[in-house]
Amino acid sequence: MHTLVFLSTRQVLQCQPAACQALPLLPRELFPLLFKVAFMDKKTLVLRELVHTWPFPLLSFQQLLQECAHCSRALLQERLSTESMQAVILGLTARIHTQETEAGTQPLCRKHALRVLDMTGLLDDGVEQDPETMSMWDCTAAVARTCIAQQQGGTAEPGLSPVPVEIRVDLRVNRASYTFLREALQSSVASPLRLCCRDLRAEDLPMRNTVALLQLLDAGCLRRIDLRFNNLGLRGLSVIIPHVARFQHLASLRLHYVHGDSRQPSVDGEDNFRYFLAQMGRFMCLRELSMGSSLLSGRLDQLLSTLQRPLESLELAFCALLPEDLRFLAQSSHAAHLKKLDLSGNDLSGNQLTPFQGLLQAVATTLLHLELTECQLADAQLLATLPTLTRCASLRYLGLYGNPLSMAGLKELLRDSVVQAELRTVVHPFPVDCYEGLPWPPPASVLLEASINEEKFARVEAELHQLLLASGRAHVLWTTDIYGRLAADYFSL
């Protein structure tokens, strides 16, 4: 829905040269809406000039591109246009260049000079990008190259120095982009464009490069560190963790593939693990911890006991958890604060079921997001757990993909979950009824790879839809799509 003000603004921007000439005559209060309309409609000349002459200290994508009173479209929930993103960057460099070459004349009022360009919060769903949209990798590269070019091509003359602009971004780095991102961070220290990272995600980066990058980041800006596919091991983790622990205001730490055999621990392995635990105790503000695909069998108590404050998000996917790990978590101070819990890939079907049910009871008051993908939960286990599960009254998201559930089990879940008024999304498996010749119990790999009978599944979907309609729950999404943007990030809960 668009207001008359929005439609009038869109009309004003139809002729870009005229709109650019008119900008100095327009009230500054119109600039936020002008920015959103120009960004949405790819009015790149206007967009560049808007950034060039921005009259406020802050230009924030999260503020300007969300749903507003004049336009219900939230651009940050979409992939952003490459043309529009590049226009913003060009407008910023033009602004700095103007200040450098015309320093003595002060063409831009320093009282209202732009101080912060906040480009954080861009959609990063991991899906292959449209060539006309900018991924997080593209954004990282574009901003980094701009900082490098600005430092190499600076032409400031004696007199009034340019007003520094802090560029806040979420950075994504891998082996291919590491070198120029490191150069950009080094260059920005003495540049009028100061690169400031809010969330860092490093994928498959060598240990020494990870450390070098961490040493260049501003401890006051960083909110999240996410190290993916690095297969660190305890030895590698003991090298990296002190460099991570200096960010004592870090809110989210995501570490993956930290391997170490807890069943046959070596002396060095134990020393490295104790050192890791000691460093984890330095974080004062940690709210989210993810240790996906890390071997934590029987060690969860050691890990969680070192933390200074209760967690609100805990991801322990494929961590080979034991019953005692689940019992400890249920009795810990973390349970009463957890909003998000991911136990995917841990077998909850045997002697772990009762401790798991106890854990659900402990987190029922606060839990919003529960992920149980590939947990070997068949109908019997699900039905036994439903009385506890439905006590999670605030639950919004339930992930059950990859579990051997039948249509009967799914229907029972749907009926019982009617009492969960906040539930909005259920990611369910293809029912075992839709497969042919499944071994029993079916391994998760078989459920993920085997072909299903499309005709049978179409009937299942239709029946589930009718049950949702009959129960007045048509607004709840039941889906088998595990690749959509359905799982909420902790910071959006």
From Swiss-Prot:
<dbReference type="GO" id="GO:0019900">
    <property type="term" value="F:kinase binding"/>
</dbReference>
<comment type="subunit">
    <text>Interacts with IKBKB; disrupts IKBKB-IKBKG interaction preventing I-kappa-B-kinase (IKK) core complex formation and leading to a decrease of IKBKB phosphorylation and NF-kappaB activation. Interacts with CHUK.</text>
</comment>
<keyword id="KW-0677">Repeat</keyword>
<dbReference type="InterPro" id="IPR050694">
    <property type="entry name" value="PRAME_domain"/>
</dbReference>
<feature type="repeat" description="LRR 2; degenerate">
    <location>
        <begin position="194"/>
        <end position="218"/>
    </location>
</feature>
<dbReference type="InterPro" id="IPR032675">
    <property type="entry name" value="LRR_dom_sf"/>
</dbReference>
<dbReference type="GO" id="GO:0032088">
    <property type="term" value="P:negative regulation of NF-kappaB transcription factor activity"/>
</dbReference>
<feature type="repeat" description="LRR 3; degenerate">
    <location>
        <begin position="219"/>
        <end position="246"/>
    </location>
</feature>
<dbReference type="GO" id="GO:0034122">
    <property type="term" value="P:negative regulation of toll-like receptor signaling pathway"/>
</dbReference>
<keyword id="KW-0433">Leucine-rich repeat</keyword>
<comment type="similarity">
    <text>Belongs to the PRAME family. LRRC14 subfamily.</text>
</comment>
<dbReference type="GO" id="GO:0005737">
    <property type="term" value="C:cytoplasm"/>
</dbReference>
<comment type="function">
    <text>Negatively regulates Toll-like receptor-mediated NF-kappa-B signaling by disrupting IKK core complex formation through interaction with IKBKB.</text>
</comment>
<keyword id="KW-0963">Cytoplasm</keyword>
<feature type="repeat" description="LRR 6">
    <location>
        <begin position="308"/>
        <end position="339"/>
    </location>
</feature>
<feature type="repeat" description="LRR 4; degenerate">
    <location>
        <begin position="247"/>
        <end position="282"/>
    </location>
</feature>
<feature type="repeat" description="LRR 1; degenerate">
    <location>
        <begin position="111"/>
        <end position="146"/>
    </location>
</feature>
<feature type="repeat" description="LRR 8">
    <location>
        <begin position="364"/>
        <end position="391"/>
    </location>
</feature>
<dbReference type="Pfam" id="PF13516">
    <property type="entry name" value="LRR_6"/>
</dbReference>
<feature type="repeat" description="LRR 7">
    <location>
        <begin position="340"/>
        <end position="360"/>
    </location>
</feature>
<protein>
    <recommendedName>
        <fullName>Leucine-rich repeat-containing protein 14</fullName>
    </recommendedName>
</protein>
<feature type="repeat" description="LRR 5">
    <location>
        <begin position="283"/>
        <end position="307"/>
    </location>
</feature>
<dbReference type="InterPro" id="IPR001611">
    <property type="entry name" value="Leu-rich_rpt"/>
</dbReference>
<feature type="repeat" description="LRR 9">
    <location>
        <begin position="392"/>
        <end position="416"/>
    </location>
</feature>
